[in-house]
Amino acid sequence: MPKIKTHRGAAKRFKQTAGGKWKGSHAFHSHILGKKTAKRKRNLRKVTVISMADARRLKRLLP
């Protein structure tokens, strides 16, 4: 039986917290930023907790 491979793209983007939740950065903060307000861009810099639906998917990508 071969080893299960880690999805390298997901491994670089998401980290698991000590409590078992997943954290990652917000989307929509790489380009086309001129029309977005300063408050919105400031909030997009923060780290976010991944939703439970996506966390189940991450569990499969990152064994």
Curated annotation (Swiss-Prot):
Picking any one GO molecular function of the record gives: structural constituent of ribosome
Please, which domain of life does this record's source organism belong to? Bacteria
Q: Which Gene3D superfamilies match?
A: 4.10.410.60
An example Gene Ontology CC term for this record: cytosolic large ribosomal subunit
> Basic residues composition bias: which ranges?
1-15
Record-linked InterPro entries: Ribosomal_bL35, Ribosomal_bL35-like, Ribosomal_bL35_CS, Ribosomal_bL35_sf
Query: Keyword set for this entry?
Result: Ribonucleoprotein, Ribosomal protein
The annotated region (Disordered) lies at 1-26
Which PROSITE patterns does this UniProt record tie to the protein?
RIBOSOMAL_L35 (PS00936)
Which PANTHER family is this protein grouped with?
Answer: 54S RIBOSOMAL PROTEIN BL35M, LARGE RIBOSOMAL SUBUNIT PROTEIN BL35M
In which family does this protein belong, per the annotation?
Belongs to the bacterial ribosomal protein bL35 family.
Q: What is this protein called?
A: Large ribosomal subunit protein bL35
